[in-house]
C-alpha cells in the first residue's frame, strides 16, 4: 500500500500524481487518515523533481495538525531548507505551506520567521525574488496575526 502511495506521488504522469496529491491534501484537512504515512512522505522532500518536492511540502503541512507524536520535530530543519530551494517555485510553495505548519504547530513560528529573516534570496532572478519576498511577507502576517490571537 505505502509503496503504491509513493509510486503514485512520483509517477511520470504529473497530472495524475498531482491529482493524487490534491486528494491527500484535501482529505488531510478533515481526517488523519494519511498521517500514518507521514514517514513515507518525508523522503519526497529531497526528490530530484521539484514537482514531487512541492507535493511533499503541502502533504506534510496538511498533516501537521494531526502530528500528536511530534514527528515534525525531526523534519522541520529539512523542511525549512526549502525556503531557498534551488527552484524558486518550490521555495514559494514551501513558504506558503509554512503558514499551515505554523498554524498547526505554533512552537515553530519563531523558527519559521527567523528562517525568513536570514534567507539568502540572492540566487534567484530579479523577476522571482520580489514574488518570494511577497510570499514571505504574507506568511509572516498570517503567523504573526495567529500569535496575537492566541
Predicted regions: what they are:
Residues 1-32, 136-150:
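N-terminal alpha-helical scaffold/docking segments in eukaryotic complex subunits
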Residues 1-9, 32-43, 69-82, 106-120, ...:
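Amphipathic alpha-helical scaffolding segments comprising HEAT/armadillo-like alpha-solenoid repeats
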Residues 10, 46, 65, 84, ...:
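Alpha-solenoid HEAT/Armadillo repeat architecture
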Residues 12-14, 48-50, 86-88, 124-125, ...:
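Short inter-helical turns and helix N-cap capping residues of alpha-solenoid HEAT/ARM repeat scaffolds
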Residues 20-22, 38, 56-59, 95-96, ...:
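Hydrophobic core positions within HEAT/HEAT-like alpha-solenoid repeats
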Residues 25-26, 61-64, 99-100, 117, ...:
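Structural signature of alpha-helical solenoid repeat scaffolds
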Residues 48-88:
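Helix-adjacent hinge/juxtasegments
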